[in-house]
Swiss-Prot record:
Annotated GO MF terms: translation elongation factor activity
The protein's name in its UniProt record: Elongation factor Ts
Keyword terms: Cytoplasm, Elongation factor, Protein biosynthesis
Source species of the chain: Leptospira borgpetersenii serovar Hardjo-bovis (strain JB197)
Parts of the chain that traverse the membrane: none
Length: 199
């Protein structure tokens, strides 16, 4: 078993912002392999986030972002349980990251539940017609369609989108990491994206 050194703990702490003891435990659990320790911490954070997901988020802030060319702007309501967290610089930085995601990736909906049923059915119909035009049989279509719908959701729903700075995680993962870090529930309530000449 490889030795867990203070340098390894420090590096893991710098890369993850996790607590010193959490970093030490992660390295011990993963034979001092820093990449595996990062994954372990992320999984642990997501588990922590799941426990906090039911809590009410009555505090928060409106975060804004105007893209450098002045032609795209975003307003985001990001909520937390306490004003202590919502006034934190890292909370605001999270809001800015999410705003930049919205500006860059132009999601249409917050999450899958917010897609109107009629819109989802229309998309399913289009996908089905495309598959039929490709000569796919009904049983093939039934197997292919769920994957195509999942891909569509990952493109149009903010929380399902791959994070533009690190496509190994989604916006939902980013929020769960923040929940684990701050120790309280954080939710994205609303967002609006404006574009000059857009509808």
């Amino acid at each position: 078993m490889a030795a867990v050194t203070t340098d390894l703990i420090r590096e893991l702490r710098e890369r993850t912002s996790a607590g010193m003891m959490d970093c030490k435990k992660a390295l011990e659990e993963n034979n001092a392999d820093i990449e595996k320790a990062i994954t372990w911490l992320r999984e642990k954070g997501i588990a922590k986030a799941a426990k906090k997901a039911g809590r009410e988020t009555k505090e928060g802030r409106i975060v804004s972002y105007i893209h450098g060319n002045g032609k795209i702007g975003v307003l985001l309501e990001l909520n937390s349980e306490t004003d202590f967290v919502s006034k934190n610089e890292e909370f605001e930085a999270l809001g800015k990251e999410i705003c930049m995601q919205i500006a860059a990736m132009n999601p249409l909906y917050l999450n899958e539940e917010s897609i109107p049923a009629a819109d989802l059915e229309r998309e399913k119909g289009i996908m089905k017609s495309q598959l039929e035009a490709e000569g796919k049989k009904a049983e093939q279509i039934e197997k292919i369609l769920p994957g195509k719908i999942k891909k569509y959701v990952s493109e149009v729903c903010l929380v399902n989108q791959a994070f533009f700075k690190d496509d190994s995680k989604t916006i939902d993962d980013l929020v769960k990491e923040a929940i684990a870090k701050f120790g309280e529930n954080i939710t994205i309530a609303h967002f609006v994206r404006f574009q000059v000449g857009g509808l």
